[in-house]
Amino acid sequence: MKLNQLITATAAIALTASIAQAGRLVIKGSDTLGAKLVPQLAEAYKAQNPATKFEIAAEGSTTGIAAIIENTAQIGMSSRRAKATEISAASAKGIAMKPTVVAFDAMGVIVNSANPITSLTKKQVEQIFTGDVTDWSAVGGKPGKISIYTRNTSSGTYSDWKELAMKKRDYAGSAQKMAGHEQIAAEVGKNASGIGYVGLAYMKAGGIKVIGIDGVVPTAATVKNKTFPYSRPTFYYTSGDPSGEAKGFVDFTLSPKGQAICSQVGFVPVN
């Protein structure tokens, strides 16, 4: 074996040992899951397993899937499915990524609470976020330039929204990219002309209101019966079947207690 290959192999072994050390669970990825839900699940899990030490980094679904490929986390949180390129990259390293659906979510359209708009059509949503429509008066609102707030490009929500609401078209050039759902809600809450999208767990922020899509609002019921158009599963990704602390946490998330926490936070349980 060449020296550089030996160094790489040794580093990989050391990294594997580092993240898998007893009692340590590294979880990276989706802000949708990692900003609220997973920390609460971790707190409840730790109450039953006090020796467990969590490291949670919620920086976007892309980072969670990359962490599994790069072996820097035992669980990758994601609000989207892994792309074919990511699956291939994992396979090239001998990793068979396994997705586990842990809860369902909806991406609701939010506007400032002072905005008189109460509902938009799917076509109007597409037109707004792609920049075809730039003034509220074009969709029944008061005259004024529309300010668009979206997630950033590392976010699974960013790509899911393009697919579900924009027919895979590009975002308007004026769209302002935010690091998380809470930031989108905060900006829309401060801007009377603002519009954005957030997950179910973030829809009760101050200064905003959730509007209907063709008259249907996002709720647990409309997610379950699939009448709300912008719904999606959320995932934990692991390298093959989870083991050790990762298995314990995945199992806990899917247990009745874990799913009850999902519901309390605002997600729709899988069971």
State each model region's role:
Residues 1-8:
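Bacterial N-terminal signal peptides that target proteins for export
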Residues 11-20:
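Hydrophobic h-region of N-terminal signal peptides that target proteins for export
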